[in-house]
Curated annotation (Swiss-Prot):
This is Protamine-2. It comes from the Eukaryota. The gene is PRM2. Residues 1-45 are annotated as: Disordered. Testis. It holds the Pfam family Protamine_P2.
Amino acid sequence: MVRYHVRSPSERPHREYRQLVNGQEQGRHGQEEQGMSAEGVEGYGRTHQGCYGYRRRLCSRRRLYRVHRRQRRSCRRRCCRYRRRNRRGCRTRRRTCRRH
C-alpha cells in the first residue's frame, strides 16, 4: 500500500513560482532574515516523504504479481513485503521462490 502521494510534474512549476513571489515580497517589506517559512518546511517535508515512500518498497506490485502468478498460495503469502524484519530483499530466499 502506497501511503504518500507523489506530485505530478505539472504542479511543481506553480509551487516554485509561488515561493519565488513570496520571497520577493518578503524582501520588499524589509525582512532581511530569510529562513524557511512554515509553508516552505511543510512543502519540503511532503516532497521528501513522497520520494522515500517509494524507495522503501523492495519489489513493485507489478513485479510481485508477475513473479508469484504461477506459484502456490503459500509462496504468495510469504513474499518479500512480509519478510522485511528477518530478511533483506527478495533474493535471499531461493528454495520456495525460484523466480526472485
